[in-house]
From Swiss-Prot:
GO function term, MF aspect, one: adenine phosphoribosyltransferase activity
GO CC terms: cytosol
Lineage, broadest ranks: Bacteria, Pseudomonadati, Pseudomonadota, Gammaproteobacteria, Enterobacterales
Pfam family, one: Pribosyltran
InterPro entries: Ade_phspho_trans, Adenine_PRTase, PRibTrfase_dom, PRTase-like
UniProt main location, coarse: cytoplasm
Recorded metabolic or biological pathway in which this protein acts: Purine metabolism; AMP biosynthesis via salvage pathway; AMP from adenine: step 1/1
Sequence similarity: Belongs to the purine/pyrimidine phosphoribosyltransferase family.
One GO process term, biological-process aspect: purine ribonucleoside salvage
Species whose genome carries this gene: Salmonella typhimurium (strain LT2 / SGSC1412 / ATCC 700720)
Recorded catalytic activity of this chain's protein: AMP + diphosphate = 5-phospho-alpha-D-ribose 1-diphosphate + adenine
Protein name, as recorded: Adenine phosphoribosyltransferase
């Protein structure tokens, strides 16, 4: 099943836009409204599974926290394992960490050292692509463990914030279901 224009418009219409959140001048795209509609949620998962079902994916990685909501069901649909990437001190076993830049400071992500095996073909899934910093850090973690990652999938791409171009420089092909301008 290839996504039709009608299906993609349905998904776009299921995402509410909130003006001046979290601060004045921002138009926030709220993917949780898509989750509230079981038809929209199911369709988003079906379309991602369909796109990657023959790609030889061996693991799906989702980044905290909304990446879990889309990554885990995509992994189930592909019949592969799901690996969470989390904020510091949230994973119980041995981890490695990657620090990345934020607008004002830094943050860090962690992954279990035994979650990705050398040669794993990994798909990264998240709810939204903005500047690409979080996904770039996630990709670095996967590659440090010997995983191969060439693709990242998103529900929303805020296309004018430069995330897709940033990730392309890292050899990542980005796919998103719903494009929006970023604010």
């Amino acid at each position: 099943m290839t996504a039709t224009a009608q299906q993609l418009e349905f998904l776009k219409n299921s995402i509410k836009s909130i003006q001046d959140y979290p601060k004045p001048g921002i138009l926030f795209r709220d993917v949780t409204s898509l989750l509230e509609d079981p038809k929209a949620y199911a369709l988003s998962i079906e379309l991602l599974v369909e796109r990657y079902k023959n790609a030889g994916i061996t693991k799906v990685v989702g980044t905290e926290a909304r990446g879990f909501l889309f990554g885990a069901p995509v992994a189930l649909g592909l019949g592969v394992g799901f690996v969470p990437v989390r904020k510091p001190r949230k994973l119980p076993r041995e981890t490695i960490a990657e620090t990345y830049e934020l607008e004002y400071g830094t943050d860090q992500l962690e992954i279990h050292v035994d979650a990705i095996k050398p040669g794993d073909n990994v798909l990264v899934v998240d709810d939204l692509l903005a500047t690409g910093g979080t996904i770039e850090a996630t990709v670095k973690l996967i590659r440090r463990l010997g995983g191969k990652v060439t693709d990242a999938a998103f529900i929303i791409n805020l296309f004018d914030l430069g995330g897709e171009q940033r990730l392309e420089k890292q050899g990542i092909t980005c796919y998103s279901l719903v494009p929006f301008p970023g604010h």
